[in-house]
C-alpha cells in the first residue's frame, strides 16, 4: 500500500536521536474522555469496545486531538487488554469500574491452557492502524502500542485492576514457574501483535509497562524487564513503507532501573514525573554508543489543572531539566520527546492542553536559538 509522504518527521527524528528544530510533543491518552468530541463519538458507539472495534470510530477518535492541537504524533486508539481478550479471557468494561476479565488466569491449568492468540481475532486493530495511517495523509507519524508482558499478566491474573497486586505477586513468589510460562506466552503474543501493527502501517511502536514499578528490585529485572527484552528481540525493524520503526519502552515507576533499561534493544525510554530528566540524560541519553536512548516524558499530568501561566512555567522546568537540545545535524546526540509522565486525566480542561502544546513548541524553539 503506498503511503503519503511524511510532512512532519520531528517525532521520528527525535526517536533516532537526530537534531530537530523543536522538541516534539504528544500525550499519552491524547484521544480520550477529556475531549467533548470523544465523549460524543463514544456515545454513538455505545461502549468502549464498540469504539475500539469499529475502524471508522477508532480512526475518528485517534484524529480528534490532532484537529485541536499541533501534536507531533498520533497514537492508535485501542486498549492494552485486547491481547488477553483474544486469548479468550472475556474482557468487559463496566461503567465506573474499568476493565474486567470473566475468566482470569488463576492456577496451573489456566496457565497451561494459554497460548499466543490467532492474530486474526485482532484484525479490527490492524484495520484501524491502516485506516488511521491513510487518514493522517502524512500529517504526523502513527504510533502503535501494546501493554508489556508483566502489565498484561497483572490484569490477567487479578481479573481487573488492583490496588495491592496480591494475586499476581502470590503467583510470582509461590509459583515462579507458572509466572515465567505466562510471561513467555505474553511476550510472544505482544511481539506478534506489534509486528502486525507495523505491517499495517505503524511508524513507531511503544510498550507500556504501566505496572513494572510495583515490583521489588530483582523481581523487576526477572519478571518485567527480561520479558520486555524478549518482545523487543522479536520485533521486525522496518515498516510497511520500508522505513525503520523506532521502539519506545515506558515503565511507570521505573526510574530506579534506568541503567538496566539502557541495555534494552530500543530507541526511546519513557519516564514518569518522579524521574530527574537531567540525571536520566546522563545515565541513558549521553554517549555515542548504540545503546544510548532518546528520552520521552515527563511532566506530571496534574500540572494540566493549573492555570495556563503555571503550565507554561512547568513546561519550562521540564525543558530546562533535560537541558540544551542536541543541535548537530551531522551526528546523533541526546534528544527529548515531550510527554506526560502518565496518561492524561479525563477531567483535564482541553484549553489547558492547548497551552501546554503551544508552550513546548515555542519554548523549545527559543532554547535552540539561545
From Swiss-Prot:
The keyword Transmembrane helix does not apply. One of its GO terms (cellular component) is cytosol. It catalyses: uroporphyrinogen III + 4 H(+) = coproporphyrinogen III + 4 CO2. It comes from the Bacteria. One of its GO terms (molecular function) is uroporphyrinogen decarboxylase activity. Substrate binds at residues 29-33, 79, 155, 210, 342. One of its GO terms (biological process) is protoporphyrinogen IX biosynthetic process from glutamate. Keywords: Cytoplasm, Decarboxylase, Lyase, Porphyrin biosynthesis. Pathway: Porphyrin-containing compound metabolism; protoporphyrin-IX biosynthesis; coproporphyrinogen-III from 5-aminolevulinate: step 4/4. Gene3D superfamilies: 3.20.20.210. Pfam families: URO-D. Catalyzes the decarboxylation of four acetate groups of uroporphyrinogen-III to yield coproporphyrinogen-III. This is Uroporphyrinogen decarboxylase.
